[in-house]
Swiss-Prot record:
Pfam families: AAA (PF00004), AAA_2 (PF07724)
Organism: Nitratidesulfovibrio vulgaris (strain ATCC 29579 / DSM 644 / CCUG 34227 / NCIMB 8303 / VKM B-1760 / Hildenborough)
Name of the gene: hslU
Stored CDD domains: RecA-like_HslU (cd19498)
Name by which UniProt lists this protein: ATP-dependent protease ATPase subunit HslU
GO MF entry, a single one: proteasome-activating activity
Function statement: ATPase subunit of a proteasome-like degradation complex; this subunit has chaperone activity. The binding of ATP and its subsequent hydrolysis by HslU are essential for unfolding of protein substrates subsequently hydrolyzed by HslV. HslU recognizes the N-terminal part of its protein substrates and unfolds these before they are guided to HslV for hydrolysis.
GO biological process assignments: protein unfolding; proteolysis involved in protein catabolic process
Family: Belongs to the ClpX chaperone family. HslU subfamily.
Alphabetized HAMAP family for the sequence: HslU (MF_00249)
Source superkingdom: Bacteria
Length: 441
């Protein structure tokens, strides 16, 4: 578990998310409390439940990004789901327990990757021996010393990269192509369907066939195979279950869409309340049956989010409200925040586009006045059309760099400066024609 302090967590989040200090501080404390809980004596530890959070704010202000970056920072299994995709069991939609099953799948994949990294050196050593067997098949006529000498020479050539493009024949698993049929498509039957597919997979193991491939591709496949052999799959599942139960994060988006706000029809109110009541046992703490065994949700952190334009958290059923004691409102974004988003984050859009075009030999630089003009345009379009927050910057950048992105292969060595005049040239027609801006930006 991460030992970062709340201040260090906020500092790391600042590298990727601009502003929203209140939300960052709240999630940082929530993660630190998990670390604190692990240091309590067992009798008290089980009594300390996570304080689930509701983030309120319009789209594109950083709700999902904060949760996703937090999970990555702490090495926690993380899944984002949308509340509107779940309906009462028996109606069209997905069973709410599927979010826990999906989180467990992510946890197993995460631990498998970690364990594979740990045994990679041993896997590479074993894969190298198998690779040399492909290059120099066993022959009764070969003398021991002669064969070993040839093998050592091939080993040296391989390590120097001289054999990467040589082709060999290798036995691989035959991939199953074509559409996959759902065994059970009814809500609540996903778990049974997964178990049935696993059973069929064990009864009819994958067929293997000979395939010609380059040595580098064969090497990658062999390393994966050897790493899989070295892993204790039962241990992987046990660690994953522990990680999911103690540090897992489920991000429930669009929670406001299942709240009964003003002006909603009574029929839809009943359906929305049904979704909330289905969510309640999972959030309260229950045991969910997965293909890897039973998973407890008592200490999974739930972060819910929504715009709450036409409803408010108090429109949720009281029992669910009580399970989300922490509320934080995220600030809307204006031109100053857009400018900071274009300049401050470690993964700023300007750096991304400059790096992409640099692969074609085209150098793109952004002036300060050009970035401020983009920020001003984004704020203006958000105010006059639909406010989609920072996502507006993506459409702006695509529009501004559309020509150079298309012509880049024909213009290697060229330098393009995106200043205020360049921005106005590419966006002015959209600003003048308000109807056009609705479709293009």
């Amino acid at each position: 578990m991460s030992t970062l302090t709340p201040r260090e967590i906020v500092s790391e989040l600042d590298r990727f998310v601009v502003g929203q200090e209140k939300a960052k501080r709240m999630v940082a404390v929530a993660m630190r409390n998990r670390w604190r809980r692990q240091r309590l004596e067992p009798s008290l530890r089980d009594e300390v439940a996570p304080k689930n959070i509701i983030m309120m704010g319009p789209t594109g202000v950083g709700k999902t990004e904060i949760a996703r970056r937090l999970a990555r920072l702490c090495g926690a299994p993380f899944i984002k789901v949308e509340a509107t995709k779940y309906t009462e069991v028996g109606y069209v939609g997905r069973d709410v327990e599927s979010m826990v099953r999906d989180l467990m799948e992510i946890g197993v994949s995460l631990i498998r990757d970690e364990e594979a990294t740990r045994v990679r050196a041993r896997a590479e050593a074993a894969a190298e021996e198998r690779l040399l067997d492909l290059l120099l098949p066993q022959s009764p006529a070969d003398g021991g010393e002669t064969r070993q000498s040839t093998r050592d020479k091939l080993r040296g050539l391989w390590r120097q990269g001289h054999l990467d493009d040589r082709e060999v024949d290798m036995e691989v698993e035959e991939s199953t192509k074509g559409p996959q049929m759902d065994i059970f498509a009814m809500p609540g039957m996903e778990s049974m369907g997964n178990q049935f597919r696993d059973l069929m997979g064990k009864a009819f193991p994958a067929r293997r066939k000979m395939r010609k491939m380059k040595l580098r591709e064969a090497w990658n496949l062999l390393v994966d195979e050897e790493a899989s052999r070295l892993l204790d799959q039962d241990k992987v599942v046990d660690i994953a279950r522990e990680r999911v139960e103690q540090t897992g994060i489920i991000f429930i988006d669009e929670l406001d869409k299942v709240a009964s706000g003003e002006g909603t029809h009574r029929t839809t109110d009943i359906s929305r309340e049904g979704v909330q009541r289905d969510l309640l046992p999972i959030v309260e703490g229950s045991v969910v049956n997965t293909k890897y065994g039973m998973v407890r949700t008592d200490h999974i952190l739930f972060i819910a989010a929504g715009a709450f334009h036409f409803s408010k958290p108090s429109d949720l059923i009281p029992e669910l409200q009580g399970r989300f004691p922490l509320r934080v409102e995220l600030d809307p974004l204006g031109r100053d925040e857009f400018y900071r988003i274009l300049t401050e984050p470690h993964n700023a859009l300007t750096r991304q586009y400059a790096a992409l075009l640099a692969t074609e030999g085209v150098t793109v630089s952004f002036t300060d006045d050009g970035l401020r003009e983009i920020a001003a345009f984004a704020e203006e379009v958000n105010e006059e059309t639909e406010n989609i927050g920072a996502r507006r910057l993506y459409t702006m950048m695509e529009r501004i760099l559309a020509d150079i992105s298309f012509d880049a292969p024909d213009r290697p060595g060229e330098h393009v400066t995106v200043d205020a005049a360049y921005v106005r040239t590419h966006l002015e027609d959209v600003r003048v024609d308000k109807d056009l801006s609705r479709y293009i930006l």
